[in-house]
């Protein structure tokens, strides 16, 4: 048996009457890795998380968790013991407004059975880790949503668990707070924690996950490293920004760029498109994903006088393409001009502020 496995789902299924919220999921999470659990709203992510937390019981299948060095099947008899090795943030945290973060952390440390004589020292460690010293003794009612989310994550790890489970930890947060939460998650990985993170934000997952599990309509449709998933995504999107281009000439500029890059994209003309995102001033080119084609496109744009100040293929863009292909019931995407506006709407919905 693999001693590195910390959580394992075996044929995990949850059925509500005739509806399968989760269907026959098999998944292993290894020690010290971040696994991103990705899917659109209603895909089955939260249901899976709640089964892991024993808030819902599986209709079929098993959950195995490592406790005291052994992988053990989760049941009503051992749930308190096994789940004590996991820190959960399943839903947006809600705290009494008139208490302080210090009191909240003391409460959760006691609730989780952390040694009484070590609680104060543990709280000081958490304060330093989350940079909470300026507001640890202030009343929570004055806090932003991002600050409350930090307290929620801090409460989840106050008892120093080996495994941390976070359900949509960045939902509803502003960009600054999302970056802070991302950095805290990476710090937790650095000190050896195993993290299972659900999200519908592709950009969030692509930045931090070692492996990505993609779920749709209750079915696990992919589980692999980001690099391997990207290799399977045959198409990619180049993002680039130009220096000082006139806004009024965008339409003619897009047409000209498309004529320049069409022979170099590695895909047929009817699939070619070039896009411009006005809010972020970012141009997009759809191509086959090969490094050589990417270089040829870059050189051709420079040769034709385009002054490029940024040029990249964001990981989130690659993951987005694969995700869209997998959840599309037809098994393919139409990237022709007739469907271009539809693609942009999906793009904006799935990757919020990717290029901010």
Which residue ranges define each predicted feature?
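C-terminal coupling/interaction segments
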Residues: 289-356
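ABC transporter nucleotide-binding domains
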Residues: 5-7, 14-197, 202-216, 222
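ABC transporter nucleotide-binding domain
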Residues: 182-284, 288
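Short alpha-helical
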Residues: 77, 96, 203, 221, ...
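Short regulatory "switch" loops immediately downstream of catalytic or recognition motifs
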Residues: 62-72, 256-264, 329-330
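A short linear hydrophobic-aromatic micro-motif
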Residues: 131, 270-274, 307-312
